[in-house]
């Protein structure tokens, strides 16, 4: 990551106030170097967490995704209307209290409708991120769907009601995905409840 990208990311995060986004305490720069004082985020990446968790339940998968949706709802509705554009298991941290943290804003942009894109993560990037197409909040929703798929595929006993949610998130046409993360979160909450009910039978 070049110095301009690092500085842009730091300035972007510094203006955000959310408990599950890293805090930038200070940015110091001169002609030679950049010094960024940032909150240390402890925990495991979601990839590591899933790889070291046996038989994760559908309700837990939904809980992680709901917490991620809470962060994205804040980003999408803040003054700068931020689209993250690099949601993947490596950029999601699970701390010791099972809180979900979102890191790496190097590819993020202000406001929906722009076509600028930074680094693309194959397997998690939406189709519109390739080829300079319009980027919207549904671009992030696609990536959430792929993260859901990553978690669901780790356990063959995952409740099959989760897969229709994944399929809607990852539709090729972004305007046929969930309208916003609030709608996606509601669907995840319903799926989690049905899984708990199913487990009790």
Placement of each model-derived feature along the sequence:
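AlphaC helix of the eukaryotic protein kinase fold
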Residues: 1-15
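Activation-segment/catalytic-loop signature of the eukaryotic protein kinase fold
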Residues: 27
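Conserved short submotifs of the Hanks-type protein kinase catalytic core
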Residues: 31-45
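AlphaC helix of the protein kinase catalytic domain
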Residues: 46-56
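Activation segment signature within eukaryotic-like protein kinase domains
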Residues: 64-65
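Conserved activation segment of eukaryotic-like protein kinases, specifically the C-terminal portion
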Residues: 115-128
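Conserved catalytic-loop aspartate of Hanks-type protein kinases
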Residues: 140
């Amino acid at each position: 990551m070049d110095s301009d990208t690092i500085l842009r990311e730091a300035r972007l995060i510094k203006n955000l106030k959310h408990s599950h986004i890293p805090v930038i305490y200070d940015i110091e720069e001169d002609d030679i170097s950049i010094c960024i004082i940032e909150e240390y985020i402890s925990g495991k990446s979601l990839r590591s967490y899933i790889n070291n968790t046996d038989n994760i339940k559908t309700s837990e998968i939904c809980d992680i995704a709901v917490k991620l949706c809470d962060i994205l709802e804040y980003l999408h509705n803040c003054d700068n209307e931020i689209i993250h554009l690099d949601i993947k298991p490596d950029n999601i941290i699970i701390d010791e209290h099972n809180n979900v943290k979102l890191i790496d804003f190097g590819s993020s942009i202000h406001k929906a409708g722009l076509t600028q894109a930074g680094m693309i993560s194959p397997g998690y990037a939406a189709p519109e991120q390739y080829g300079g197409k319009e980027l919207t909040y549904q671009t992030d929703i696609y990536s959430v769907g792929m993260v859901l798929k990553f978690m669901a595929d780790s356990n063959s006993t995952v409740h099959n009601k989760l897969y229709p949610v994944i399929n809607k998130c990852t539709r090729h046409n972004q305007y046929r995905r969930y309208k916003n993360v609030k709608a996606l979160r509601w669907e995840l909450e319903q799926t989690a409840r049905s899984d708990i009910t199913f487990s009790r039978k």
